[in-house]
């Protein structure tokens, strides 16, 4: 695909991969990409700067696993970076309450500018570290239906210590991963590193190995 970047080409690309996108949603997704590339000239938001590659490596990779996620409640996107997957998921699933957690101040500033321009209700930026929930989550806060991680490596403590503090009973902890992660999980699996309840695979165009989504469910 070597077409002029536009909301129309973005929409055609996603529609061609089975993701229904309205013209208004395509405009918002395109603005996300456009502003990210503009800010990337002075801030390190992404190493991927070609429009075609962004469509695959950021947008499509964010949206294809949506079919396996509970996106009707309150969702936390950990280490969201430039807003992937949280912002695209929120645009296509407006019913979810999306919270974007990011520790980098420049990326937090970018996200605030992006969300102000999109005027998208029900999406919030949290400045903090996943490992320090006391800085962004209190016992009075409503727990999350889903915690999602696309660019953060899952550690045992994420599942045994942190997830129970912020996930509601029956909630889902989801991690995006490349094909090599399955072996790593098998090698490190202990009682403190439980097996995923589900493993889902999907393919991205131009990539030889499948991507995977690992899902853990919080005990009720």
UniProtKB/Swiss-Prot annotation:
Subcellular localization: Cytoplasm
Catalyzed reaction equations: guanosine(527) in 16S rRNA + S-adenosyl-L-methionine = N(7)-methylguanosine(527) in 16S rRNA + S-adenosyl-L-homocysteine
PANTHER family per the UniProt record, alphabetical: S-ADENOSYL-L-METHIONINE-DEPENDENT METHYLTRANSFERASES SUPERFAMILY PROTEIN
Keyword Plastid: no
Protein name: Ribosomal RNA small subunit methyltransferase G 1
Residue spans crossing the bilayer: none
Disulfide-bond pairs as recorded: none
GO CC annotations, alphabetized: cytosol
Residues engaged in binding S-adenosyl-L-methionine: 79, 84, 150
Principal EC category: transferase
Pfam families: GidB (PF02527)
Record family assignment: Belongs to the methyltransferase superfamily. RNA methyltransferase RsmG family.
Keywords: Cytoplasm, Methyltransferase, rRNA processing, S-adenosyl-L-methionine, Transferase
Gene3D superfamilies hit by this protein: Vaccinia Virus protein VP39
General function of this protein: Specifically methylates the N7 position of guanine in position 527 of 16S rRNA.
EC number annotated for this UniProt entry: 2.1.1.170
InterPro entries attached to this UniProt entry: rRNA_ssu_MeTfrase_G, SAM-dependent_MTases_sf
A GO molecular function held by the record: rRNA (guanine-N7-)-methyltransferase activity
């Amino acid at each position: 695909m070597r077409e002029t970047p536009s909301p129309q080409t973005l929409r055609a690309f996603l529609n061609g991969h089975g993701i229904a996108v309205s013209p208004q949603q395509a405009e918002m997704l395109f603005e996300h990409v456009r502003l990210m590339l503009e800010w990337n000239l002075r801030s390190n938001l992404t190493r991927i700067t070609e429009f075609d590659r962004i469509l695959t490596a950021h947008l499509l990779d964010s949206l294809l696993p949506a079919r396996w996620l509970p996106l009707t409640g309150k969702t936390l996107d950990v280490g969201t970076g430039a807003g992937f997957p949280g912002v695209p998921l929120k645009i296509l699933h407006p019913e979810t309450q999306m919270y974007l957690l990011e520790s980098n101040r420049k990326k937090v500033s970018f996200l605030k500018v992006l969300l102000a321009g999109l005027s998208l209700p029900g999406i919030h930026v949290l400045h903090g570290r996943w490992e320090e929930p006391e800085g962004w989550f209190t016992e009075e806060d409503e727990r999350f239906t889903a915690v999602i991680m696309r660019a953060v490596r899952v550690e045992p403590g994420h599942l045994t210590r942190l997830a129970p503090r912020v996930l509601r009973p029956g909630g889902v902890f989801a991690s995006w991963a490349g094909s090599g992660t399955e072996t790593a999980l098998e090698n490190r699996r202990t009682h403190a590193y439980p097996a995923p309840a589900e493993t889902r695979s999907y393919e991205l165009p131009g990539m030889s190995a499948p991507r995977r989504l690992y899902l853990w469910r919080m005990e009720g």
